Amino acid sequence: MAAPTYYTITFGCQMNRADSERMAGILESLGYVPAEDELQADLVLFNTCTIRDNAEQKVYSYLGIQAQRKRKNPAIKLIVAGCVAQQEGERLLRRVPELDLVMGPQYVNRLGDLLAQVEAGNQVVATEPVEIPEDITKPRRDSRVTAWINVIYGCNERCTYCIVPLVRGREQSRQPQAIRAEIEDVARAGYREVTLLGQNIDAYGRDLDPKTNLASLLRFVHSVEGIERIRFATSHPRYFTEELIATCAELPKVCEHFHIPFQAGSDAVLKRMRRGYTQERYRQLIQLIRQYMPEATISADAIVGFPGETEAQFQETLQLVQDIGFDFLNTAAYSPRPGTPAAEWPDQVPEEEKSDRLQRLNRLVAEVAAARSARLLGQVQEVLVEGPNPKNPRQAMGRTRGNRIVFFDGDPEQLQGSLVPVRITATRAFSLSGEIVKPGEEKPQAAELGACT
């Protein structure tokens, strides 16, 4: 008898990708094997995102197709996990009665138990707040080079636009020993890089007894043999301390790429967002990072068209982007999320105005990023090879320690997982091209090898 097959479809953030890898590992421990096509799978799992409306609507579009399959073949199992599942709960079953299991993010490690209930003939909704247990099942990781490692779940912030605290629950930090054990496991499996994940990762450890922090965790895991690079995301400006900055500058494996969302450049908008800092505090933070690590790569998130945002306030966002000089910036027009305070405010910005502001911001972002990239022309960068260039399989693709994508000639299969010196021969806003530096030729400077640039 053939083994049952599964297929996962993941929407949203890195946390969701890490959760999907863990759920895939659980399914394989139960005897499932991956399907090549979601239309052929015996079990289809949607790991959903509700941070913006368009992501949520994509979920329902996919669900409609799978519901038709299930009506023809009731043996198919349909699961919706993640933030849409947590937000909608029973309402999701009423909208798509073909579903077998609706489960929030806090239940990822309990998937096996929930599936047992489904196998017993039950339609299950699991969205009640629970503590997230440690799970010894190995995730089925998508990459063979870099591994996602969850270190803190949930969020205690109350930003007026954000649904995350409502759907992912309060902060729950993992024990340092459990995190190190997982990193040691991926190192033994041949991984060279880990990315530590959390909604607000720099809040790590304040809920533990005894309390600890992200700087201490980085020191604790830094000595794991085999791991060459350590990254972390996503950071909140309020918790990004000088101790953390100094620790990152000191530890050679910790990459000098920092993702720190600012969301808006106007203090008035930041106050309405309930972000807990000013644009001047954000500027000072980035300045301090660059004092310790002048070549640090800085990325962020920004929202345009927040309720009540004026043109003058939007101009402050443009000015901040220009002044900081971001290397990457994730931008979005404000999307009202049900259950958040900002969604109920009367001073919503018209859609056409939001679209116009987003286009103007994106143009500036591309200009600034292109100028930042151009500084690397002719430099030799250490690149961790991830695999083939998706658009040219004969080329290899990898990332610098500053998280810039680099394309270069080479055998992707042979080089995958290797750290290679690459001279940058062409720069673009969000990617680079280069050539491998052969033995005996110019090598990266010590600063480029010893720290993430």
Curated annotation (Swiss-Prot):
Residues 141-372 form the Radical SAM core domain. Keywords: 4Fe-4S, Cytoplasm, Iron, Iron-sulfur, Metal-binding, S-adenosyl-L-methionine, Transferase, tRNA processing. One of its GO terms (biological process) is tRNA methylthiolation. Residues 374-438 form the TRAM domain. Binds 2 [4Fe-4S] clusters. One cluster is coordinated with 3 cysteines and an exchangeable S-adenosyl-L-methionine. It comes from the Bacteria. Residues 4-120 form the MTTase N-terminal domain. [4Fe-4S] cluster 2 binds at C155, C159, C162. GO terms for molecular function: 4 iron, 4 sulfur cluster binding; metal ion binding; methylthiotransferase activity. It catalyses: N(6)-dimethylallyladenosine(37) in tRNA + (sulfur carrier)-SH + AH2 + 2 S-adenosyl-L-methionine = 2-methylsulfanyl-N(6)-dimethylallyladenosine(37) in tRNA + (sulfur carrier)-H + 5'-deoxyadenosine + L-methionine + A + S-adenosyl-L-homocysteine + 2 H(+). Its cofactor is [4Fe-4S] cluster. One of its GO terms (cellular component) is cytoplasm. SMART domains: Elp3. The keyword Cytoplasm applies. Its EC number is 2.8.4.3. It is an enzyme of class 2 (transferase). Its main location: cytoplasm. It is found in: Cytoplasm. InterPro entries: Elp3/MiaA/NifB-like_rSAM, Methylthiotransferase, Methylthiotransferase_CS, Methylthiotransferase_N, Methylthiotransferase_N_sf, MiaB_methiolase, rSAM, rSAM_horseshoe. Catalyzes the methylthiolation of N6-(dimethylallyl)adenosine (i(6)A), leading to the formation of 2-methylthio-N6-(dimethylallyl)adenosine (ms(2)i(6)A) at position 37 in tRNAs that read codons beginning with uridine. Belongs to the methylthiotransferase family. MiaB subfamily. HAMAP family: tRNA_metthiotr_MiaB (MF_01864). This is tRNA-2-methylthio-N(6)-dimethylallyladenosine synthase. The gene is miaB.
